[in-house]
Amino acid sequence: MRRITLILMFLVVLMVFSATAYAQKEWLVGDFIEANANTRGITRLTLSADDQIHVWGKCHPSDCDWGWVPVDTYGPDVSADLQAAAKYVSAIYQPGFARTFVIVKPLDENKIQVEVFTKFTDHSRRTPYMFRQILIRREDMALKP
């Protein structure tokens, strides 16, 4: 547990000191998809206005539904208005065999970067891993400039 806490603290510090433009929280709400049909990662991600995330991962024959979990939103400082200056949201998935941290960063009105960190908890000796990908807002859900 201490190790997980240290990892989370490291990720938060990394996010705070990274050079990222601020975004309206509205940019983080919506349905996003992976443009590459051959992805081995996340295929779809939905962020709701009530601070929930729903993720689907690549599986065969149909995508794996990770379900809805709450997100935490991060701003540039302790007094930031998160509606106007959201920098990241994060969520934790715990399906029983692993603990997965999902970190979402808005890139622009219709594009997000997703980083996924997975640590296996089932004593399988599988190596913890991470991947990063860019998802685009579904065209029928795109924000109008």
Short names for language-model regions:
Residues 7-16:
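Bacterial N-terminal signal peptides
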Residues 17-23:
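Sec/Tat signal peptide C-region and signal peptidase I cleavage site
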Residues 34-100, 140:
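Central antiparallel beta-sheet cores of small beta-barrel/beta-sandwich binding domains
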Residues 72-75, 118-145:
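Edge beta-strand at a domain terminus
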Residues 108-110:
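Residue-level recognition of beta-strand termini and adjacent short loop/turns
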